[in-house]
């Protein structure tokens, strides 16, 4: 039978690392959400200005 090894960390350093990585992760998520919103706003602007051209570009010809 295979033996399992258990590694146990001691001290509170892990909690500090976890808290800082969680804060950094939250900051990154907020930045990505902001960038995504900006991109979607830009797409909306293009569609408002050129909706007809946009649709024509994606209409398949020949009934395909």
Swiss-Prot record:
InterPro entries the record matches: Ubiquitin-like_Pup
UniProt modification remark: Is modified by deamidation of its C-terminal glutamine to glutamate by the deamidase Dop, a prerequisite to the subsequent pupylation process.
One GO MF term: proteasome binding
KW Coiled coil (keyword) present: yes
GO biological process: modification-dependent protein catabolic process; proteasomal protein catabolic process; protein pupylation
Similarity-based family: Belongs to the prokaryotic ubiquitin-like protein family.
Oligomer and partners: Strongly interacts with the proteasome-associated ATPase ARC through a hydrophobic interface; the interacting region of Pup lies in its C-terminal half. There is one Pup binding site per ARC hexamer ring.
Domain notes: The N-terminal unstructured half of Pup provides a signal required to initiate unfolding and degradation by the proteasome but is not needed for pupylation, while the C-terminal helical half of Pup interacts with ARC to target proteins to the proteasome.
Record protein name field: Prokaryotic ubiquitin-like protein Pup
Provenance organism: Mycolicibacterium paratuberculosis (strain ATCC BAA-968 / K-10) (Mycobacterium paratuberculosis)
Upper taxonomic lineage: Bacteria, Bacillati, Actinomycetota, Actinomycetes, Mycobacteriales
Gene designation: pup
